[in-house]
Curated annotation (Swiss-Prot):
Pfam families: DUF150_C, RimP_N. GO terms for cellular component: cytosol. Belongs to the RimP family. It comes from the Bacteria. The gene is rimP. SUPFAM superfamilies: YhbC-like, C-terminal domain, YhbC-like, N-terminal domain. Its main location: cytoplasm. Gene3D superfamilies: Ribosome maturation factor RimP, C-terminal domain (2.30.30.180), RimP-like superfamily, N-terminal (3.30.300.70). PANTHER family: RIBOSOME MATURATION FACTOR RIMP. InterPro entries: Ribosome_maturation_RimP, RimP_C, RimP_C_sf, RimP_N, RimP_N_sf. It comes from Staphylococcus haemolyticus (strain JCSC1435). This is Ribosome maturation factor RimP. Keywords: Cytoplasm, Ribosome biogenesis. Required for maturation of 30S ribosomal subunits. GO terms for biological process: ribosomal small subunit assembly; translation. The lineage of its organism: Bacteria, Bacillati, Bacillota, Bacilli, Bacillales.
């Protein structure tokens, strides 16, 4: 996490807590000449357009007062969507028995990407049920080897 995203989290978390929204992710990126501050929020039952608009207005006001970002940027507040990131401990536990996609820093069994059902989580590893050809098997992945994890849509 960058210094900017950490500072943004510090500014907006109390605002989102007051609105009963969960902060899912803060991302600050440059695309071409433009900078984007993307904030994903959620709540029990999901967020709608009105929720995102309200959060955006409150976040914008707070950022105008304490903005840690020196560049001009576009603020985008949205739902995390079906393929929401899995970052926090509770995200992993909420994803048990659901499809997930995991990208690794280094290959395990020859692959750096795994798609399957998350079966178990502990402090050091996750266990996934994956399909390999016509068979199903379980693999254990050390959590310190996970670059990114997210929910997945399997068809």
């Amino acid at each position: 996490m960058s210094k900017i995203t950490e500072e943004v989290e510090t500014i907006i978390t109390p605002i989102l807590d007051e609105l009963n929204f969960e902060l899912v992710e803060v991302e600050y990126t440059k695309e071409g000449k433009d900078h984007f501050l993307r904030i994903s929020i959620d709540k029990e039952g999901g967020v709608n357009l009105n929720d995102c608009t309200l959060a955006s207005e409150k976040i914008s006001e707070a950022m105008d007062e304490n903005d840690p970002i020196p560049d001009m940027y576009y603020l985008d507040v949205a739902s995390p969507g079906a393929e929401r990131p899995i970052k926090k401990e509770k995200d992993y536990h909420n994803a048990i028995d659901k499809p997930v996609f995991v990208s690794l820093y280094a290959p395990i069994e020859g692959d750096k990407e795994w798609l399957g059902i998350l079966k178990a989580v502990d402090d050091d590893t996750i266990t996934m049920e994956v399909k390999e050809k016509a068979k199903t098997k379980q693999i254990e992945i050390p959590r310190n080897k996970i670059a990114k994890a997210r929910h997945a849509v399997m068809i």
